[in-house]
Amino acid sequence: MNKTTEYIDAMPLSDIEKAALPKTDIRAVHEALDVEHRAYSREDDSPQGSVKARLEQAWPDSLAEGQLIKDNEGRDQLQAMPKATRSSMFPDPWRTNPLGRFWDRLRGRDVTPRYLSRLTKEEQENEQKWRTVGTIRRYILLLLTLAQTVVATWYMKTILPYQGWALINPADMIGQDLWVSFMQLLPYVLQTGILILFAVLFCWVSAGFWTALMGFLQLLIGRDKYSISASTVGNEPLNPEHRTALIMPICNEDVDRVFAGLRATWESVKATGNAAHFDVYILSDSYNPDICVAEQKAWMELIAEVQGEGQIFYRRRRRRVKRKSGNIDDFCRRWGNQYSYMVVLDADSVMTGECLSGLVRLMEANPNAGIIQSSPKASGMDTLYARCQQFATRVYGPLFTAGLHFWQLGESHYWGHNAIIRVKPFIEHCALAPLPGEGSFAGSILSHDFVEAALMRRAGWGVWIAYDLPGSYEELPPNLLDELKRDRRWCHGNLMNFRLFLVKGMHPVHRAVFLTGVMSYLSAPLWFMFLALSTALQVVHALTEPQYFLQPRQLFPVWPQWRPELAIALFASTMVLLFLPKLLSIMLIWCKGTKEYGGFVRVTLSLLLEVLFSVLLAPVRMLFHTVFVVSAFLGWEVVWNSPQRDDDSTPWGEAFMRHGSQLLLGLVWAVGMAWLDLRFLFWLAPIVFSLILSPFVSVVSSRSTVGLRTKRWKLFLIPEEYSPPQVLVDTDKYLAMNRNRTLDDGFMHAVFNPSFNALATAMATARHRASKVLEIARDRHVEQALNETPEKLNRDRRLVLLSDPVTMARLHYRVWNSPERYSSWVNYYQGINLNPLALQKK
């Protein structure tokens, strides 16, 4: 069999179609497939002429009429996006320095963000009503939190052992020995630090407690006068003038899972009869060439399977500016003015058609709503860690989400996905300028969602949580280490966002959102410092003699005090704040029915196991988050390169590498405290033994086998597992289908396989006009690539080749026309197996 025959056999043609092609040489095959009979001055450009024919052979049902167009040089191009209609979207520079703003005001250059009234008088009255209610509620929350914190801090002060602060006179210490003064002050300095940290941490816990409590009451009563979901009855027809874009920004994601969830979502939309009101945009920032080719293939298959021509679009950016927020901004600039609303989806998002239609109805019923955030439910994971987290978010999450809505109303959170956004105000107000200055807290904003919500509210638009709208789903990280990688990014992003705390015009609620975002991670080093100071105080108490006389001529000694009854009362009160929300959550399930959670016994046992699991993980997260915060402030780059693994489980080697320092700290801490005072070790036991067990918990909890066993036992069961909605059933079905036909080593197949080469060539985006300089550069790229082995061709060079239709055509022609000359490429490709289901043959 000669090379031409092999080439023809690689195409998805019937025997009759193959027999009709010439067997003389590769160029003749391409010329025969070119119905326009174009003449190319270079023979290695001949594959460009057959692109259309090869695409129609492989994906005949994916190409809409007129979708294959000509670029400026007459090359075939697959039009994967609609025609752009550009809008202007530019950010205002941040003024984070209040002194600078004061100087601007003195010079008459201060610009106050304006509230543009878009509402009728009646709508303005309703708007003012809920804003007033929200303000009153938040003052009540502040009062409750501060009062609770003051009482708890006073109790804490009374139970600390050293009560002689008032007797210490700095003037009396001047003449005495320095060491004596130091030893007199040390326990009181430690106690003061402990007291301050306790107050901050207790205030943080108290705010969460009141949020959960109000959420419990909201869900128990079942009626919410100010719920945005109450503004519609749920069956109003959608306005055909207001179209919605479903946009999914992705970057090097699991292609099979992305397109399975997207297909299930789109089919659910079609089932509602509202598909004409929606379009889908897959916005790729992927820079792995293999994944890029797999995305293109999956997009073609998706269009064919759901008849999505003209409604499902795909774009891969070559210039990945500002990450996800920049990807969304690029969409808004090019196509945003074609839509009234857009729904942002994550790579793991799945939403029902009813939920999406409901979000659109809410937007139409509330003309001053800028963002409406759904409350996504976690599901779809099998590891013990993920199933435990799924259960926790499913059981406790509704309380906190409803509580957030109660306190915030239309000045709420936006989590960056599974939310609908009004496009016009987003374009006008939500472009993000880089933070000024230098260092780790300057540059492009990482956690864009909170900032976009704050800017939307600053412009006068509402930001709501539709906490009671069903049909929104997401997935969680499969194991602890994967979650911590995500937390590292979120930690840095939230610390950056705090620079916007004093930016002019921000609503107080969103200033509080920035503060709570920081405290989500800053609480970890504060807790660690609290434990460290408590340990240090115990060391001082055990190893030094107390200073009984703190003043000259003091008649009575100051005895260290220990009031165990108050300590136990304070400890019990703190535990109530921490664990009562969990108890309220399970009580709510007991009241409304436990069948979907496995029954009364199993859901209660699952709760107890989850509490134990959270106790084991809390100190581990504390230390990791402490490292993340310190690294961010010091400008260190936290490198986290995990070994490649075929499943979600954590290898023992990686576990000990990541948790080894925690295990060592736990051992040293436990031994030290046992030597000093066994009674103090009792109080520290949940901390130190969690650290000692951290590698083992990390590994065992990452195992799917353990997670699936708990599923068979109906532990950590959630309603989405007991009675899965159709959209999740479809996602699993399409995921299995996609796994069977998955495409690995996409770049090499795009070089060798005729069909995938045609697809890559047609979707390449670097379509420059011909020039001598460009031709020289192309030849250099191709020659350098072919003169090396494929293993030495790095990711960036592969991307350059993949982005240019001419280089892909020339690579394809040369490796087939001169296999002896480029034997290293041919031999490498022969070692790669093309999944026989990846390309359907006739």
UniProtKB/Swiss-Prot annotation:
One of its GO terms (biological process) is glucan biosynthetic process. The lineage of its organism: Bacteria, Pseudomonadati, Pseudomonadota, Gammaproteobacteria, Enterobacterales. Belongs to the glycosyltransferase 2 family. OpgH subfamily. One of its GO terms (molecular function) is hexosyltransferase activity. It is a multi-pass membrane protein. PANTHER family: CELLULOSE SYNTHASE CATALYTIC SUBUNIT A [UDP-FORMING], GLUCANS BIOSYNTHESIS GLUCOSYLTRANSFERASE H. The gene is mdoH. It comes from Citrobacter koseri (strain ATCC BAA-895 / CDC 4225-83 / SGSC4696). InterPro entries: Glucans_biosynth_gluTrFase_H, Glyco_trans_2-like, Glycosyltr_2/OpgH_subfam, Nucleotide-diphossugar_trans. The chain crosses the membrane at residues 140-160, 194-214, 513-533, 570-590, 615-635, 656-676, 680-700. Its EC number is 2.4.1.-. CDD domains: Glucan_BSP_MdoH (cd04191). This is Glucans biosynthesis glucosyltransferase H.
